[in-house]
A protein has these predicted regions:
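Active-site rim elements
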Residues: 213, 219-225, 323-328
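Outer-membrane beta-barrel pore domains
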Residues: 29-31, 35, 45-53, 90-92, ...
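A residue-level signal for conserved active-site and pocket-lining positions in enzyme catalytic cores
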Residues: 14, 237, 410
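Alpha-helix capping and helix-loop boundary segments enriched in small/acidic/polar residues
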Residues: 175, 224-225, 398, 438
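Outer membrane beta-barrel
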Residues: 61-216, 225-266, 333-384
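Intrinsically disordered, low-complexity regions of eukaryotic proteins
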Residues: 6, 16, 47-50, 61, ...
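Cleavable N-terminal export/targeting peptides
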Residues: 1-47
């Protein structure tokens, strides 16, 4: 391990111990996050936050915070993730054995209780280094306006930050279908005693850009989504239907959500490509033209040390005039779902697992969490029209493919700053001709991730 990383770890452990000292236990907490970071947790109102100090000062109870007044402060953030991976069998195009999967710095905070902001920078992404750069005006809890560069309000898992995921890898369907960061304007809020949250926005369309991590396939007449002539519209609503006194307490936290997004892909561009867990292609690009529609639903239950999650997503790309005779073809259809569960075996509530009751080096071992997930992704033509399946990108019935993935893992939280994740991933493809290695349909991957968040 590099000397500078060792020094960082030692300093972080000292900071973690100091951060939980009784003298700092009453410091102010981070305010309500905007809906773009939905995690299923109730959002506290900044006016309810306790504040004991006055004047300009530093607060290190959670992370470095410069407090300018009771309601104005700046948080300085650092997020690091380092991965080690092994594969069996080894794919034709394997991912790197080791990688910094996340190196992000940023600031976030609020100016009075009515304005909050964030700016984060990805160190390892020279093409698009800026992640969230936005300002959120919140005159009322029921009506807030957010503008800048942030996540499109779509998909519970996509809106969950990378350091808060239960698994080392996002579900493949979420990565493929759900839009990510884009520049736009969004109206959002929470109503009905916070049982309902909503968001609706219009965006520039950069979230429809083809994945920049993989080279563009050289298909004749096909170009990537490099210009964004049409806007992307999206909305999301979440509801806690059982949040009533007559309902058992463990059921009140059930939350369901629904979302949709609408955009347009012009002729000469190509649609979604099926990608495996580590980005290898198992369904190539095809010709598309027309409307791009996304929709989905999800549900979550957190009760004590247990959490259960389900999400379904679907995406459709029209193929107008893309046949060999310039005729319209059936839509390109991508569908995915996953079911996931987590249980904290050391007894902490799931909502509090990142702050173990007995941290390492302070009389305990930290918190241990067991997790499991099954996910399913299919991609092909929406209709066959009685035609045989074909690998041609202009065929009526595109030869589809399916990826089924099982993941089991263990998460260790030694203290509030560190997390260690170990995942075993089994991936199976339906079409043996289009997998990660010719003739093989089943692959295993093993990942160890060390995470540090300040």
């Amino acid at each position: 391990m590099r000397p500078e990383l060792i020094a960082l770890v030692v300093a972080a452990c000292q900071l973690g111990a100091a951060g939980t000292s009784p003298g700092l236990a009453q410091s102010a907490q981070w305010p309500a996050a905007p809906l773009t970071q939905v995690t299923g947790q109730p959002t506290p109102d900044p006016k309810d936050e306790p504040t004991t100090a006055r004047g300009v000062h530093w607060d290190f109870s959670n992370h470095p915070r410069l407090v300018l007044s009771d309601e104005t402060f700046i948080d300085f953030r650092l997020k690091l993730q380092w991965d080690y991976r092994t594969f069996s069998p080894l794919p034709d195009d394997p991912a790197d054995d080791t990688e910094w999967s996340l190196r992000r710095v940023g600031v976030e905070g609020q100016v009075t209780r009515y304005v909050e902001f964030e700016a984060s920078f990805e160190i390892d992404d020279p093409d698009e280094p800026w992640r969230a750069v936005y300002v959120n005006a919140r005159p009322f809890a029921a009506l807030q306006v957010q503008g800048g560069h942030f996540k499109v309000p779509f998909s519970r898992e996509r809106l969950t930050g990378p350091t808060n995921l239960d698994f080392t890898q996002r579900a493949v369907g979420v990565r493929l279908i759900a839009p990510g960061y884009d520049t736009g304007l969004m109206v959002h809020g929470r109503v009905w005693n916070r049982r309902v949250r909503y968001a609706a926005g219009v965006f520039g369309g950069a979230a429809d850009e083809i994945d920049s991590e993989t080279d563009v396939p050289s298909l004749p007449g096909v170009r990537p989504l490099q210009t964004y002539d049409d806007q992307l519209w999206a909305w999301r609503v979440t509801l806690r239907p059982l949040d009533w006194k007559a309902v058992p307490a463990w059921l009140r936290r059930v939350e369901v959500g629904a979302n949709a997004a609408y955009s347009h892909v012009d002729e000469g561009r190509y649609g979604w490509r099926g990608r495996a867990v580590f980005g290898q292609e198992f369904f190539p690009a095809v010709y598309v033209n027309g409307k791009r529609t996304r929709y989905g639903a999800d549900a979550e239950l957190e009760a004590g040390p247990v959490a259960l999650r389900w999400e379904y997503l679907r995406g459709l790309d029209e193929r107008l005039g893309q046949g060999v005779a310039d005729d319209d073809l059936p839509e390109l259809d991508v569908g995915s779902w996953f079911v996931a569960g987590a249980v904290v075996v050391t007894g902490e509530r799931k909502a509090d697992v990142e702050r173990p009751r007995r941290p390492l080096l302070r009389g305990g071992f930290g918190a241990i969490e067991a997790v499991a997930r099954v996910e399913h992704l299919t991609i092909g033509s929406r209709e066959t029209l009685g035609e045989p399946a074909s690998y041609s990108p202009r065929s009526v019935n595109l030869a589809g493919n399916r990826d089924t993935i099982w993941t089991v893992g263990v998460n260790w939280y030694p203290d509030r700053l560190f997390k260690v994740q170990v995942d075993a991933i089994r991936e199976r493809f339906e079409d043996r001709a289009r997998t990660l290695l010719g003739g093989q349909d089943t692959f295993w991957s093993y990942v160890v991730r060390v995470q540090f968040v300040l």
